[in-house]
């Protein structure tokens, strides 16, 4: 999978998180920061960190490892940022969902390996391969026809989800404006 699919899903969760903020339209820089944070969270298991195991889809794609990290981050956020808009339960839940969406999306790809979602408890791999989803070939240029095809398929598959979340976010803001009027 490419970062495009993960990023589009991260933006989808960011739009929903921002719809819960009362003054989201008045804080453009904050909104950009939230969007970038959610995109980073959605791509986090693929970050090239030492001993992270991304190339094997084990440590970095384990539900146990990621859930433990998410719980740690939430505990820190709740402790250090008590009362701030970004420490609210709905915002933190959407951030966690953006992070965990990575595991589900990677299981859709047709590389045949699956992901070791239950590592270290089990060596079983989750493989929900969808035939038209494939990985990009890093040995080829990013602009090669095969890689552009992978990007295009991801764009077509995940953009409707982003558009749907933007529509839901718009409706939430409109209802809030009507309730306040």
Stretch-by-stretch model annotation:
Residues 1-181:
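N-terminal membrane-targeting hydrophobic helices
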């Amino acid at each position: 999978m490419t970062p495009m699919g993960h990023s589009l899903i991260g933006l989808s969760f960011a739009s929903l998180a921002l719809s819960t903020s009362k003054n989201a339209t008045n804080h453009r820089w904050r909104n950009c920061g939230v969007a970038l944070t959610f995109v980073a969270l959605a791509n986090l298991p693929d970050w090239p960190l030492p001993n992270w195991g991304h190339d094997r889809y084990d440590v970095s794609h384990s539900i146990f490892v990621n859930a433990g990290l998410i719980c740690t981050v939430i505990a820190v956020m709740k402790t250090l940022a008590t009362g701030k808009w970004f420490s609210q339960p709905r915002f933190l839940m959407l951030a966690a969902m953006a992070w965990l969406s990575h595991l589900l999306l990677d299981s859709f790809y047709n590389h045949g390996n699956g992901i070791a979602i239950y590592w270290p408890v089990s060596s079983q791999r989750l493989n929900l391969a969808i035939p038209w989803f494939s990985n990009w070939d890093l040995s080829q240029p990013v602009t090669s026809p095969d890689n552009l095809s992978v990007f295009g398929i991801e764009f077509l598959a995940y953009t409707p989800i982003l558009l749907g979340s933007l529509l839901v976010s718009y409706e939430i803001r409109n209802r809030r404006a009507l309730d306040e009027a």
